[in-house]
Design a protein with these regions (language model features):
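A short acidic, Gly/Pro-enriched loop at the edge of an enzyme's catalytic core
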Residues: 94-103
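Conserved S-adenosyl-L-methionine
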Residues: 38
Length: 202
């Protein structure tokens, strides 16, 4: 019953997805399965499945609230699996059975409790194959300091909405990653004071 134009949409996706796919191209294999966490409206995975047609994409989110939008957007794609519930704050992460080469997480860890970042790497340790990657995108502090005035203001607005949210410190994220067997490979500077962070499994 849904028209594509009527589906929920985030304008930032259209702005960043091309830049994100350019970074991912350097790290993703030709074949394999990639899990996207916090898929939201499915706008990123809709773009990625066309950009990387030989990869299988698995969308997921903490609830099935927006699955109707994901299903509608990818209904013509043959390389996107049905969306699954993956709650990074839960002790078990839902119906994740197979080995994934990578986990892609875009614009989540600053609008979720810190425990969701821990849960992300805890899950990744269990489901990612050897030498697989975790890709994070979003704003980050470095050395405990904001990299721009706009990020500082954004952080304040996030914390005003929810005290458990906020722009994360990159070094803190790296420590969590290392705890679960991932090392920091590279940080790519992105438009609008965002970063692409690549972690690889030991």
């Amino acid at each position: 019953p849904y028209n594509i134009m009527e589906l929920p949409s985030y304008p930032s996706t259209a702005r960043n997805r091309i830049f994100i796919s350019e970074v991912l191209r350097s790290y993703l294999p030709k074949n394999g399965t990639v899990l996207e966490t916090a898929s939201g409206t499915g706008e990123h995975i809709t773009f990625f499945c066309e950009e990387f047609p030989k990869l299988i994409w698995q969308p997921s989110d903490k609830s099935d609230e927006l699955f109707f939008a994901i299903r509608k957007r990818v209904e013509a794609a043959d390389n996107v699996k049905k969306p699954i519930v993956v709650d990074l704050l839960a002790e078990s992460f839902g119906p994740i059975k197979e080995d994934y080469f990578g986990v892609v997480n875009i614009n989540m860890i600053h609008i979720a409790p810190w425990e969701a970042c821990i849960g992300l790497f805890q899950m990744a340790e269990k489901v990612i194959t050897a030498k697989g990657i975790v890709y994070l995108y979003g704003p980050f502090k470095q050395g405990g300091k904001h990299t721009s005035e706009s990020n500082k203001n954004f952080d304040l607005s996030l914390r005003a909405q929810n005290t458990s949210w906020g722009v994360r410190n990159l070094e803190d994220v790296q420590r969590v990653a290392e705890t679960f067997g991932f090392y920091h490979v590279f940080t790519h500077e992105m438009p609008a004071n965002n970063k692409s962070i690549i972690f690889k499994k030991n």
